[in-house]
UniProtKB/Swiss-Prot annotation:
ATP binds at residues 79-87, 102. Interacts with ksr-1. Pfam families: Pkinase (PF00069). The keyword Ribonucleoprotein does not apply. This is Dual specificity mitogen-activated protein kinase kinase mek-2. One of its GO terms (molecular function) is ATP binding. It catalyses: L-seryl-[protein] + ATP = O-phospho-L-seryl-[protein] + ADP + H(+); L-threonyl-[protein] + ATP = O-phospho-L-threonyl-[protein] + ADP + H(+); L-tyrosyl-[protein] + ATP = O-phospho-L-tyrosyl-[protein] + ADP + H(+). Its EC number is 2.7.12.2. Residues 73-360 form the Protein kinase domain. Activated by tyrosine and threonine phosphorylation catalyzed by MAP kinase kinase kinases. It comes from Caenorhabditis elegans.
């Protein structure tokens, strides 16, 4: 994008990621789950009967797939690109099981590739209705294949391109699933997600919402560290200025994602009163931004697509966080995202405080995903509004 003409105004120099967990003194994922029987793990999660049944069915199917290799899979088509790799829909030839296979091409030593596959094996320990299921991983030449549960509704960034923006009630259900998924990863698997964004939130026609592409392999994270070529960043301000990754960083990314789902566009730079007025087809004086945030003194281009990558990163650090307009959204969701998007990590919400928030509790007991399931089914064959 910059072809050498843009300077890095932040002097970005992100700290290493692999050893951050081990330095914290926390148990590794393998240590955390190796000695706990599956039945006990599921009981501890407090799942509903439908959740337990669906998870058990997945594990039974998975039991029939002992190993994976290139010749065992038949590619059916491309599902999308994401985080350094292409994702294809595949069929396991022997069992007929449909999978999503992420293919990551890395020019690295064979020993490093094998170590990455070993680290990815921790995903076998993830048994949660809020985490996408894992079938296995293997290496073929310079390609690492990560085989996952197929979610027929695909990712929320794709859904968003089809419907424009999501109703608040569905964003409420998504919020519950994501917070519970992040909590499971942190408390049970002892890892942070590190890449929370709509494209890593998957949905299916059962109304389930699951996280994928989390940072279980430190070596894979490091191997892909120089491959960022995206036009968006969900990274928290403190990460862009060199601080270590914490759960607060995941919560910032989560909050930014929620705003995007609600307004239908990546919210950096933060929408102005004028843009919101156009979005909701009202006069500009009818737009009142939440949290008493006035028009920012920081004036970047209003269109995210026109921002160079380092302009965008500079805005995340120095510009105001996005805020939702009153009248068009409830006070509950406005307050919820505001708590996630505090610039200082020490002032940001925690996973525990989010679960006690009124917006979360409003949707926390909705076992019946029927309405959301119908919505997802209705989007599957829709064309994108802006292909």
């Amino acid at each position: 994008m910059s072809s050498g003409k843009r300077r890095n105004p932040l002097g970005l120099s992100l700290p290493p990621t692999v050893n951050e967990q081990s330095e914290s003194g926390e148990a590794t994922a393998e240590e955390a789950t190796a000695t706990v029987p599956l039945e006990e793990q599921l009981k501890k999660l407090g799942l509903t009967e439908p959740q337990t049944q669906r998870l058990s069915e997945f594990l039974q199917v998975k039991e029939g797939i002992k190993e994976l290799s290139e010749d065992m899979l038949q590619t059916e088509g491309e599902l999308g690109h994401g985080n350094g790799g292409v994702v294809n829909k595949c069929v396991h030839r022997k069992t007929g099981v449909i999978m999503a296979r992420k293919l990551v091409h890395l020019e690295i030593k064979p020993s490093v590739r094998q170590q990455i596959v070993k680290e990815l094996a921790v995903l076998h320990k993830c048994n949660s209705p809020f985490i996408v299921g894992f079938y296995g991983a293997f290496v073929d030449n310079n390609d690492i294949s990560i085989c996952m549960e197929y979610m027929d509704g695909l990712s929320l960034d794709i859904v968003l391109k089809k419907v424009g923006r999501l109703p608040e009630k569905f964003v409420g259900r998504i919020s519950v699933a994501v917070v519970r998924g992040l909590t499971y990863l942190k408390d049970e698997i002892k890892i942070l997600h590190r890449d929370v964004k709509p494209s890593n939130m998957l949905v299916n026609s059962n109304g389930e919402i699951k996280l994928c592409d989390f940072g279980v392999s430190g070596m894979l994270i490091d191997s892909m560290a120089n491959s960022f070529v995206g036009t968006r960043s969900y990274m928290a301000p403190e990460r862009l200025t060199g601080s270590h990754y914490t759960i607060s960083s995941d919560i910032w990314s989560f909050g930014l994602s929620l705003v995007e789902l609600l307004i239908g566009r990546y919210p950096v730079p933060a929408p102005s009163q004028a843009e919101y007025a156009t979005m909701f087809n009202v006069a500009e004086n009818e737009i009142e931004l939440a949290d008493s945030l006035e028009e920012p003194n920081y004036h970047p281009p209003s269109n995210p697509a026109s921002m160079a990558i380092f302009e965008m990163l500079d805005y995340i650090v120095n510009g105001p966080p996005p805020t939702l307009p009153k009248r068009f959204f409830t006070d509950e969701v406005i307050g919820f995202v505001s708590k996630c998007l505090r610039k200082l990590p020490s002032e940001r919400a925690t996973l525990k405080s989010l679960t006690a928030d009124v917006f979360f509790t409003q949707y926390a007991d909705h076992d019946d995903q029927g309405e959301f399931a119908v919505f997802v089914k209705g989007t599957i064959n829709l064309p994108k509004l802006n292909p």
